[in-house]
């Protein structure tokens, strides 16, 4: 068994403004009721914390996503089905994360994560970053609004007229989630985590690090359960 301690950086597109995930991440429902998932230790939930200071008037992760979009100076209307938020899980192998916490370096670790997020995606685009301490392994749930600048990249078609495109801010998850960029994120994140004893997995390897893979599966299962429960509550309210 390998003793290598891996850095974990997992990106996923949210659905719309990703409000369904806010329940799990913020430990509360849209109407403010406390929600503790089955895999969380409610005795430790008070240790969870939001690391980003929201703008005045913004009270939640979901509102922070919309605030960024409304104030980004976008030239084009945001499509109904466009991805407005990218969710990012940041952590490391359980054994090393426990060492980081027990050695009093967790705050330094969170600071390094925030720096990497802001350097990588732009400070204004990092609208939320919640530290979870009530599950098995300490981890961060970061939320990035994929606003980019520069001309939109697309292949020209033969015979197609060329139009001048605006180069201002635009919402584009495709730009942020391109395959080449995803590989770069893994490299730069591992470099930022090196001082904490965490390193990147083997580039190009088809093998999955078991503990990391299990972590992802547990997270996705919990998300699905949260969404199903919230949908049931909405249907019940509509029936009433």
Region annotations inferred by a language model:
Residues 1-240:
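N-terminal nicking endonuclease/strand-transfer module with a His-rich metal-binding environment
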